[in-house]
Amino acid sequence: MSVHIGAQEGQIAETVLLPGDPLRAKYIAETFLEDVELYNEVRGMYGFTGTYKGKRISVQGTGMGVPSMSIYVNELIMSYGAKNLIRVGTAGGIQEDVKVRDVVIAMSASSEMGQNRVRFNGMDYAPTATFDLLHRAYMNAEKAGIPVKVGQIFTADQFYQDDFHHFKKWADFGCLAIEMEAAGLYTLAAKHKVNALTILTISDHLLTGEETTSEERQSTFDEMIRVALDTAVEVTN
């Protein structure tokens, strides 16, 4: 057991999907996995292990934001030996050609995250996805006929910003979407020499105001999940 995850040794697979919402973790496990075992419900942050296409896969809720996500990622890696970490989450679109419900694969993540400012003594670090995971995810989406966009995103520290124009600068420099975890995930993966990828569904749009419901965010977005799972089985022993 670790501080925030109540699993025993061997209960968590080497490849873990990471939704922020613990209820999305439950949905993924119940909808897509077979032989499912609940290994964690500490603080209501559900974690499950099951099989998908014959391979053991885990899914662990992380909560919102880099600080919460970092707790679970550190423990998954250091206490349970996770090797492949795939975030499946939602984001806000900030480009006109990125529509609500589109799937976005995050090649890299700019950020305003305070953790890296402290970690790198004020210098800038460029957190990026593991290319092997990114390439496999893109090819799996192509094979399944699921249109995806690949590019840079922005990881925000605040969900509610004082100034919307703060995001316009990132859009001007090509960021596709805004979310709250990817830069932290990619940084920790690099530190611990494991693999990481972020696959997102656009749940709302900062330019048009279009948005999905909380129920839809919790229990749909199946295209993103299928791409993540098909990628997971390819890198799982």
From Swiss-Prot:
<keyword id="KW-0808">Transferase</keyword>
<feature type="site" description="Important for catalytic activity">
    <location>
        <position position="217"/>
    </location>
</feature>
<feature type="binding site" description="in other chain">
    <location>
        <begin position="179"/>
        <end position="181"/>
    </location>
    <ligand>
        <name>a purine D-ribonucleoside</name>
    </ligand>
</feature>
<dbReference type="InterPro" id="IPR000845">
    <property type="entry name" value="Nucleoside_phosphorylase_d"/>
</dbReference>
<dbReference type="GO" id="GO:0004731">
    <property type="term" value="F:purine-nucleoside phosphorylase activity"/>
</dbReference>
<comment type="function">
    <text>Catalyzes the reversible phosphorolytic breakdown of the N-glycosidic bond in the beta-(deoxy)ribonucleoside molecules, with the formation of the corresponding free purine bases and pentose-1-phosphate.</text>
</comment>
<feature type="binding site" description="in other chain">
    <location>
        <begin position="87"/>
        <end position="90"/>
    </location>
    <ligand>
        <name>phosphate</name>
    </ligand>
</feature>
<feature type="binding site">
    <location>
        <position position="4"/>
    </location>
    <ligand>
        <name>a purine D-ribonucleoside</name>
    </ligand>
</feature>
<dbReference type="Pfam" id="PF01048">
    <property type="entry name" value="PNP_UDP_1"/>
</dbReference>
<keyword id="KW-0328">Glycosyltransferase</keyword>
<protein>
    <recommendedName>
        <fullName>Purine nucleoside phosphorylase DeoD-type</fullName>
        <ecNumber>2.4.2.1</ecNumber>
    </recommendedName>
</protein>
<dbReference type="InterPro" id="IPR035994">
    <property type="entry name" value="Nucleoside_phosphorylase_sf"/>
</dbReference>
<dbReference type="GO" id="GO:0005829">
    <property type="term" value="C:cytosol"/>
</dbReference>
<feature type="binding site" description="in other chain">
    <location>
        <position position="24"/>
    </location>
    <ligand>
        <name>phosphate</name>
    </ligand>
</feature>
<comment type="similarity">
    <text>Belongs to the PNP/UDP phosphorylase family.</text>
</comment>
<feature type="binding site">
    <location>
        <position position="43"/>
    </location>
    <ligand>
        <name>phosphate</name>
    </ligand>
</feature>
<feature type="active site" description="Proton donor">
    <location>
        <position position="204"/>
    </location>
</feature>
<dbReference type="InterPro" id="IPR004402">
    <property type="entry name" value="DeoD-type"/>
</dbReference>
<comment type="subunit">
    <text>Homohexamer; trimer of homodimers.</text>
</comment>
<feature type="binding site" description="in other chain">
    <location>
        <position position="20"/>
    </location>
    <ligand>
        <name>phosphate</name>
    </ligand>
</feature>
<dbReference type="GO" id="GO:0006152">
    <property type="term" value="P:purine nucleoside catabolic process"/>
</dbReference>
<dbReference type="InterPro" id="IPR018016">
    <property type="entry name" value="Nucleoside_phosphorylase_CS"/>
</dbReference>
<feature type="binding site" description="in other chain">
    <location>
        <begin position="203"/>
        <end position="204"/>
    </location>
    <ligand>
        <name>a purine D-ribonucleoside</name>
    </ligand>
</feature>
